[in-house]
Amino acid sequence: GKRAEKEIHLDKNGNMESVENISDGSKGDNLKLTVDLSFQQGVEDILKNAFNAELASGNATYSEGVYAVAMDPNTGAVLAMAGIRHDLETGESSVDALGTMTNVFVPGSVVKAATLTSGWENNAISGNQVLTDQPISFGGTDSITSWFTQYGSRAITAQEALEYSSNTYMVQVALKMMGTPYSADMKLDFDELDPSMKKLRSTFAEYGLGTSTGIDLPNESTGYLPDKFTFANYLTNSFGQFDNYTTLQLAQYAST
């Protein structure tokens, strides 16, 4: 579309005297939805049935709901946006398709590919680098572990870190981005904490995480990225346990 242009004439006191029409505006094209209604309904039914089953089994009592976005990775076309909102006070569930772009959640391990990307971009790791997956702790704090090496250690490549969903590989990448590779009883230097979080978030944004997706719909959330964070927050962010993103952002990330 094209905006109308008008020229406003003011008197010496700043009061409007007249308005002159310079050019008329024109209506823009209607939004061409790529959502197929039958497919959309199918996705919604899958979510509803699966979530109701989890509620019945007692596994989703405190869940805020379930959301899904289907996207064509070749074109970025959104094929379905479906959601079921669960009211924790009343226990009622309701359809909430727009929640896929307005509600934010901690994403978990799906961000690990972006963490590796940040490690490569910032020369913290190179190629299919081998690191030791091991319990990581600082000054007697609870250890950060991976499910497969909770009580031991194992040398793994970057590819295997994704395959096995290694938490501690990602933490070590984050530490190397700070210029402080992990070692037992290591001394912590927080001077590079803020710059390193900025680098990590910058890479995440390249995948669409923490930034606008560009979808032409109102009230889209760009995620929740707290301004204040701790060293522990930075480390856990490397495996998806701090910043919050929308389902739509995660779909864009997966399609990138």
Label each PLM-derived region with a short phrase.
Residues 3, 8, 17-53:
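N-terminal leader/targeting segments and the immediately adjacent pre-domain N-terminus
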Residues 52-61:
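Active-site phosphate-binding and catalytic loops of NTP-dependent enzymes
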Residues 112:
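Short, conserved phosphate/pyrophosphate- and ester-handling motifs at nucleotide-, phospho-/glycolipid
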Residues 109:
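Short alpha-helical catalytic segment bearing the HExxH-like zincin motif
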Residues 8-26, 35, 60-105, 117-256:
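Beta-lactam-recognizing serine transpeptidase/beta-lactamase-like catalytic domain environment
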